[in-house]
Amino acid sequence: MRKKFGSSILVCSRRWMKQKLGIQATILLLSFFVGIFGATAAIIVKNLMHLTVSFLTNTFPNAQVNYYYLAFPIIGIVLTVIYTRRIVKDHIGHGVSIVLKSIFKSEGKLRSHNMYSSMVASTLTVGFGGSVGLEAPMVLTGSAIGSNLAKLFNLNAKNTTLLLACGSTAAVAAIFKAPIMAIVFAIEVLMLDLTSAALLPLLISAATGTVLSLLFLGNTLTLDIASTQSFFLGNIPFYILLGILTGFISIYFLRMLRMIEGLFHKIKRISVKILIGGVALGALILLLPALFGEGYESINSLLKGDVADLFEKSPLFMLSHEHYMLFIFLILIVFIKVIATAVTTSAGGIGGVFAPTLFVGAFTGFLVADIANYYLGFNLPHINFVLAGMAGVMSGVMLAPLTSIFLIAEISAGYSLLIPLMITSLISYLCVSPIEKYSVYTRQLAEKGHLKTHNKDKFALKKINWNRIIDHNITTLPIHSTLREYTQYIAKSKRNLFVVLDENKKFAGLLVMDDHRDKIFNQELYDKVLVDDLMIEPEEFIYDTDSGEEMLEKFNRTQNFNMPVITHERDYIGFLSKAKVLNLYRNFIAAYSED
């Protein structure tokens, strides 16, 4: 009874909103609520993670060397795996890739558990020291909220995808208090088509997320940036150098991530993965405590110049007093952070690479400035180079230069740094993109053919379900049929095209009635000629596994108006008409181009 009553209210609400407000106003109103829910989820997760870390650090002995670091990560990964496998019973993934796949494969539809499952799993992983970030799980959470709200209101695929993007925008805006960057993220990373109809809902969600974050978390930012120094033209060569360096470190990041994922993938037993990953991660964190968790506290130590604090709980603390040893440890942190991140996710932890890219970039930028100052006698501003390094690695790993530029510019309130950020991000991107075609989020999707593209033509050809326009009504006849039997088929058919099947019901050839008119009217040949003698072999087939691009290329190459569709085993499926293909393609483009 209650369920029916609630369903009736929902139906009435949907009808009222669409009739009284119109679809555009409905989307704007829903984007506001998505902004509230997405931002609230991000705020809750941030607080839960900090509470978990505070509980662990305050409950257990605070010795000079904290050996509990050996145990925390493995406990976190075990709890995460139990939660995902026993409670959620579904693959949660690490966030952005799942969102991208849903946009491309399922019209922006995400499962309802994604509204909370990533929140819990990422809190367990990161709170217990997993060397990953919360941002990607929050993107998935916000996106799932938008997607499921769209489902509730029976919105079409285009508007579902838009509300999905609004959810991710709200979550990112709430985390960093950076609304412009959050919108750029939705466009550049989630590959949302920017239209006038899409921009306003994104603005509403981004603004709502930022305001809520300011309301509940105050003006404090994730990164404690006191002040930046003005941009000095003479430092451009160092920013160029930093761009090149962050570019190659981004390539290392992507390839090391891929390599470690591959190694863990070969391990079939989840218990062995957890054991190896947990022990390895714990040992790395014990030696280099800066690897614990997201790493924003370590970045803040760099920004304040308190580098020694990074090694306070490490067995290596005494060695860090020597400046050259400090450099060595900082370089180790840059390279080992990537390994720690890959091990965390590969062993079963849930988290993203957003925070790790900022971490690696910050340490890279600090090293460039410190080496130039200490050994070469320059006076480079550490803070500026830390920020530029963060933008450089993020740009290279995510292949998202605009997102990285606007993030650092907004969180540092330093648009005076725009030129250095642009130089570093662009050069890093240019170093990576010729070598690594896909970003950390899109590689696996591209390998499986699930990747959306900003090229509308290619997107349409991949997205459209061509099976629905296959013509299954072409008459088939056996290969040993006589001309007499062929004429009987002709009398019953409205088509002038026929398919010939062999003894095993496999595709053998085609019969075009116009090619045989002289024989059809010659009754003396009726029992002498077989269709085997008359049929032709098409010069080209469309296979059921062909992509939209391959199919269209075959039509253009052969100049045929109709082509048979078969399997690689020559099982006959039907016919595709070039006219229907182009008509469906035009309708799809028109639907996705409307404002």
Protein language model regions, located:
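Short aromatic/basic micro-patch
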Residues: A460-K463, L510, K528, F575
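The conserved cystathionine-beta-synthase
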Residues: L477-R495, V500-L501, I520-Q523, D527, ...
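Short beta-strands and strand-coil junctions in structured, solvent-facing domains, enriched
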Residues: F507, F561-N562, Y572
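Short hydrophobic beta-strand motif reused across regulatory alpha/beta modules
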Residues: G509-H516, G574-L582
